[in-house]
UniProtKB/Swiss-Prot annotation:
It comes from Haemophilus influenzae (strain ATCC 51907 / DSM 11121 / KW20 / Rd). This is Dihydrofolate synthase/folylpolyglutamate synthase. Transmembrane segments: none annotated. The keyword ATP-binding applies. SUPFAM superfamilies: MurD-like peptide ligases, catalytic domain, MurD-like peptide ligases, peptide-binding domain. Pfam families: Mur_ligase_C, Mur_ligase_M. It catalyses: 7,8-dihydropteroate + L-glutamate + ATP = 7,8-dihydrofolate + ADP + phosphate + H(+); (6S)-5,6,7,8-tetrahydrofolyl-(gamma-L-Glu)(n) + L-glutamate + ATP = (6S)-5,6,7,8-tetrahydrofolyl-(gamma-L-Glu)(n+1) + ADP + phosphate + H(+); 10-formyltetrahydrofolyl-(gamma-L-Glu)(n) + L-glutamate + ATP = 10-formyltetrahydrofolyl-(gamma-L-Glu)(n+1) + ADP + phosphate + H(+); (6R)-5,10-methylenetetrahydrofolyl-(gamma-L-Glu)(n) + L-glutamate + ATP = (6R)-5,10-methylenetetrahydrofolyl-(gamma-L-Glu)(n+1) + ADP + phosphate + H(+). The gene is folC. Mg(2+) 2 binds at H171. Binds 2 Mg(2+) ions per subunit.
């Protein structure tokens, strides 16, 4: 190890600091470096069955429901996802459990001893996850693509089933600035003669062409399967199966429906009872999540106010226009049942399309509190306010120096019947969650 001697027993924080500096570029897409190490360590086939999940939004919730279903079926399951909210350990789950620091540091040491050249943070962590999965002797692993697909580190593994959640404009510096270019990159996770499930209703031709080239069996939303909802429940069906009176769940319905489509291609005889149970159980932090009693009490203690005075508070990690569109639909439905204002606490990274986000949400948000995020990618609250007012000059917007400053300002102006939304980035939700968790 250059310039730094770390051991398996070194603290996890030291290892993560090393990983962040171990390659000259934080993001360096390509598979040659990581694949050579994976081949050396026999990590390309870590478990009998692999599902890879790609897409612009919805990957995390899709992975979570797949995981819940497979666990309820009695299988040994691992999940690799990113980014984490509070702790690195969230990125690797085995049997629905985060692993202790010691497991990660030992795995990092093993990878570091065997690497032949420098690796990026994500390459290093991907190899470590595969090593941990192989050691655990699992039945199934679910890999969440980090960025794009074709050149993403997770793509060194040949999956048996590929799932695409959605396709929209994001990460244009790396993936291209059109849906067609982005779809081509995401289709890089497809494998010859392996099934592909697509939850995006408007699929670019570049993705379909890639599937045809590889002779993939494709299951497309609204073509090969569909779902519909009413006030009390929802239904899902394809040409062979119809599931009726399904319970609503804590994740977006489109993602849940995509998972039900994916289940049809799994080599496991999963019962309808297991599917229904899993829909009722599934949840994931930061996905249009209302803050519940215990966390409301912690927030009230932090603020020094009576808990009963707090308004409804919702957190969401949505950070691009596609996610903002979904948010606006949820908030519009919610607004019909409340008497108060919609107040937003928004923090975003510099490389995100803030104007596209604002376009979807300004019609529904009454009051904005823009906050500064730290780090080299963080955007200041002043910059966000300037963007807001340049397009919507009459908007009510203020700037704060941190997420919690923004939350405090928002709550001072809020009354019991209002709704406060904390959103814009994983970083935004993480700062808030660290206070209430």
């Amino acid at each position: 190890m250059n310039n730094m001697q770390l051991k398996a027993t070194s603290p996890l924080a030291e290892w993560l600091s090393y990983l962040e500096k171990s390659h000259f570029k934080p993001i360096d897409l390509g598979l040659d470096r990581i694949k050579s190490v994976a081949e050396k360590l026999d990590l390309l086939h870590p478990v009998p069955y692999v599902i890879t999940v790609g897409g612009t939004n919805g990957k995390g919730t899709t992975c979570r429901l797949l995981e819940t279903i497979l666990l309820n079926h009695g299988l040994r399951v691992g999940v690799y996802s990113s980014p984490h909210l509070l702790r690195y350990n969230e990125r690797v789950r085995i049997q629905n459990q985060d692993l202790p620091d010691e497991a990660h540091t030992a795995s990092f040491a093993f990878i570091d001893e065997n690497k032949t050249e420098s690796l990026t943070y994500f390459e290093f962590s991907t190899l470590s996850a595969l090593h941990l999965f192989k050691q655990a002797k699992l039945d199934v692993v679910i890999l969440e693509v980090g960025l794009g697909g074709r050149l993403d580190a997770t793509n060194i593994v040949d999956s048996h089933l590929a799932v695409i959640t959605s396709i929209d404009i994001d990460h244009t510096d790396f993936l291209g600035d059109t849906r067609e270019a982005i779809a081509f990159e995401k289709a890089g996770i497809f494998r010859e003669n392996c099934p592909v499930v697509i939850g995006e209703p408007n699929v670019p031709q570049t993705m379909l062409d890639q599937a045809e080239k590889l002779h993939c069996q494709v299951a497309r939303r609204d073509v090969d399967w569909l779902f519909e909802q009413n006030a009390e429940n929802w239904q899902w069906q394809n040409k062979k199966v119809r599931l009726e009176n399904l319970p609503f769940c804590q994740i977006p319905l489109a993602n849940a429906a995509t998972v039900l489509a994916a289940v049809q291609y799994l080599p496991f005889d999963i019962s309808e009872q297991t599917l229904r149970k899993s829909l009722q159980e599934v949840e994931l932090v930061g996905r249009f999540q209302a803050i519940k009693t215990d966390k409301r009490e912690k927030l009230a203690d932090y603020l020094g106010v009576p808990v009963e005075t707090l308004p409804t508070i919702i957190v969401d990690v949505g950070h691009n226009p596609h996610a903002a569109k979904y948010l606006s639909e949820k908030l519009t439905a919610l607004k019909r049942s409340i008497e108060g204002k919609m107040i937003a606490v928004c923090g975003m990274l510099k490389d995100k399309d803030a104007n596209g986000v604002f376009e979807h949400l300004t019609p529904i948000i009454d009051e904005w509190h823009c906050v500064t995020l730290g780090g080299y990618r963080g955007q200041s609250g002043d910059e966000l306010v300037e963007k807001l007012k340049s397009h919507f000059p009459n908007i009510q917007a203020t700037s704060d120096n941190s997420v919690m400053d923004g939350v405090c300002t928002a709550l001072k102006s809020a009354v019991k019947n209002d709704v406060v939304l904390v959103f814009g980035s994983f970083h935004t939700v993480a700062e808030f969650w660290a206070v209430v968790e």
